[in-house]
């Protein structure tokens, strides 16, 4: 692609500037500087990619999405304050869990499933973000109880985020000595967050799956999970990336044509021209594509691992694995062998969570793994 672009640039220069040696020399010098700058940027990108690949060697969580690695992002300006903030974050997490666990007739009913909080600390502000899912399937409750839960949820959200002095945000600001905001995000589907997904599975009655956990859980998951078509999703994803990169190259060629048709070849125009080329080149990488267009939108693979003693008749622990879709987002698996992009890869975004629970048969563990593209 780059050789073809270079040949097109040289051919256009030769056609438009055959009779003017000075302009040709200026164009060649400009082209040389532009290509050197592009080559330096490409080398820097290669070094970054090589460094990232070396970091993933002998790592079980290869290509793990960095967005899911942390629960607390803190500005480390004082060691004692850092420890106090971490302790406060854990207390706030427990407080929110208690608030989201509603009671009906003096019984705890996990109608609202909440994920772990994500705390983003800055010098003068704290943002607490968490996801929650309103579960309508547990205990087959009637409409009056559902209305009760929805009414309580509205009151909870008002307590957290209103501007009154007794709101939870204002109360927490006294303990943190900074502004506190709470960002609650309601999920329409349980598979959008692995933490909520694993809790949803563990909240179901595990005892009724003693006589064939694999078949019963597959039947249950088929009703709530999307019908995956990872091949078409990945193909569309790759085609969108290729189309965007082709548009970048076409914009670069159009700039070259406009510059050749322009008779004013002063230094200011040349500098603006180089800046435009640099801006286009900086936006060519996959990492700079806006997330709202392509990234983290489609679930292409999920797996669930059960480990523990779930049956009274079995004295040994058993392990059951459920897998659907794919966890490998390599481009060359779906693209043509002669594709110019076959050596690149799309970083997979794995979302992992472990949840342990105890029933009357013993202790068991549920591990959920989701792959988004």
Swiss-Prot record:
Gene Ontology CC entries for this record: mitochondrion; ribonucleoprotein complex; ribosome
Keyword Ribonucleoprotein found: yes
UniProt keyword annotations, A-Z: Mitochondrion, Ribonucleoprotein, Ribosomal protein
Keyword Mitochondrion: yes
Pfam families with a match to the protein in the record: VAR1
Transmembrane segments annotated in the record for this chain: none
GO molecular function, a single term: structural constituent of ribosome
Subcellular location: Mitochondrion
Gene Ontology BP terms: translation
InterPro entries reported for this sequence: Ribosomal_uS3m_fun
Principal location: mitochondrion
Role of this protein: Essential for mitochondrial protein synthesis and required for the maturation of small ribosomal subunits.
Family: Belongs to the universal ribosomal protein uS3 family.
Name of the featured protein: Small ribosomal subunit protein uS3m
Organism: Saccharomyces paradoxus
């Amino acid at each position: 692609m780059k050789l073809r672009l270079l040949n097109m640039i040289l051919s256009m220069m030769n056609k438009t500037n055959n009779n003017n040696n000075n302009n040709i020399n200026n164009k060649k010098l400009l082209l040389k500087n532009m290509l050197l700058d592009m080559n330096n940027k490409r080398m820097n990108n290669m070094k970054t990619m090589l460094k990232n690949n070396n970091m993933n060697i002998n790592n079980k969580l290869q290509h793990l999405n960095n967005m899911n690695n942390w629960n607390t992002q803190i500005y480390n300006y004082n060691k004692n304050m850092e420890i106090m903030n971490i302790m406060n974050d854990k207390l706030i997490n427990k407080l929110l869990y208690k608030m989201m666990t509603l009671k009906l007739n003096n019984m705890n009913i996990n109608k609202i499933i909440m994920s772990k909080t994500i705390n983003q600390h800055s010098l003068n502000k704290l943002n607490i973000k968490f996801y929650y899912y309103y579960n309508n399937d547990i205990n087959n409750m009637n409409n009056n109880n559902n209305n009760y839960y929805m009414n309580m949820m509205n009151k909870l959200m008002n307590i957290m985020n209103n501007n009154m002095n007794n709101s939870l945000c204002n109360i927490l600001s006294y303990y943190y000595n900074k502004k506190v905001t709470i960002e609650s995000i309601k999920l329409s589907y349980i598979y959008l967050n692995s933490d909520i997904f694993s809790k949803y599975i563990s909240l179901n009655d595990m005892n009724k799956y003693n006589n064939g956990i694999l078949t019963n859980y597959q039947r249950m998951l088929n009703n709530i999970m999307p019908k995956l078509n990872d091949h078409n999703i990945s193909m569309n994803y790759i085609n969108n990336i290729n189309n965007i990169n082709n548009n970048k190259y076409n914009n670069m060629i159009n700039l070259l044509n406009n510059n050749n048709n322009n008779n004013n070849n002063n230094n200011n125009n040349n500098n603006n021209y180089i800046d435009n080329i640099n801006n286009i080149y900086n936006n060519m990488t996959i990492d700079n594509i806006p997330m709202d267009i392509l990234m983290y939108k489609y679930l292409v693979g999920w797996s669930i691992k059960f480990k523990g003693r779930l049956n009274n008749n079995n004295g040994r622990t058993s392990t059951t694995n459920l897998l659907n879709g794919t966890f490998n987002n390599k481009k060359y698996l779906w693209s043509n062998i002669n594709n110019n992009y076959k050596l690149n890869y799309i970083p997979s975004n794995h979302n992992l969570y472990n949840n342990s629970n105890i029933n009357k048969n013993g202790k068991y563990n549920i591990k959920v793994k989701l792959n988004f593209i």
